[in-house]
Amino acid sequence: MSSDETTSKDEIPVIDLSNSNKEELLQQILKACTTWGFFQLINHDIPLSLIQSYRESKARFFSMPYETKLKLKRNAQNARGYFDDELTKRRRDWKEALDVGVPGSRKWEAADFDESNACLDGFNQFPTQEECPDFRGITVQYFEECSKLSNRLARLMASALGITEGCDNAQILDRMALDHTSYLRLNYYPPCDTNDTTTVNPNEPPPLGISPHRDAGFLTILLQDDDCHSLQVARFEDSDLGHDDSWVTVNPIPGAVTINTGDMAMIWSNGIFRAPLHRVLTDPTKKRYSSPFFYNPGYNELIRPLDCCSLEKDLEVKYRPCLWGYFRALRFAGDLTDLGVEIQTSHFKMETKSDHIEKQDEFQKVVNFEENFNVEKYRAILESKA
């Protein structure tokens, strides 16, 4: 399928990264990021042979004995590792997952728990070579390919907005390329038979693979199974989600990856880019896999609305600056335990009364981003209700 074939209002756009017409490519990216906030990307330069090896390696990981995976369990002191109990919007997801992030040392060859690898998100926890042969090497290789593609896409997004080289917002992209705090999530969705009362509560709504949410970071690169039709994107805003036609299913193109913009891109673009609400459905008979790569800023980065966008020079500033490390810590804490109110970009809107601005200043003063974060230690800051 070529990028100009997707004209249906019920399909997210398809963009060909190999398009030699730079202006056309930028216009396609701009339209996708400002309308859907989602697009499928073809000819993205991640080798298809690597994608296939990564799919096979991922399946081997989740087929390991449960007790082996539990040895890698994440906790309140370490955001990275295996888990099967995540909360999304305060509701438990129907999935198993493993989070792997860029090491604090930026050196994958260092041992996982080497002190140099400490960072806010914690330490990686890989299975041993004996437990899951070649898993580490293949995963790291795929991670680095996603990093390169993310940097390329972020710069294209900036160009689409008319951001010029040398301005503050372009420099943020330079820093992000060097200091990004991205992580790769490996998801496994077991079959979910809603008629099986031993696993599903018949008195509650059918569980979702992942409940409706927006991604917190800058952008996401998602790899799905080619025959998977479970990812759905909200066509409308929250107030309209009660309608049956509120959700549009993403039908994966073989060999493509799916891109979506996140909360930080929305703040950075002053609301020009859309951070879309999306969810994942369960399947009663089929097991499925997916892998989102979350491209995130440095922990110390204050994400603020762009100041040199030729597209909207007179646009009123809509957001206050947002400290990524603070936003990320609160989102992780909310994944792990119910803190009552999940932090959103709406808390940083100029017209919103919120204590998060003061809280993030306090957070930056007391938290060392070169140490793994402890949810319980900083609960007093995290439990802000504003």
Segments the model singles out, each with a brief description of its role:
Residues M1-A386:
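Peripheral, non-catalytic segments flanking oxidoreductase cores
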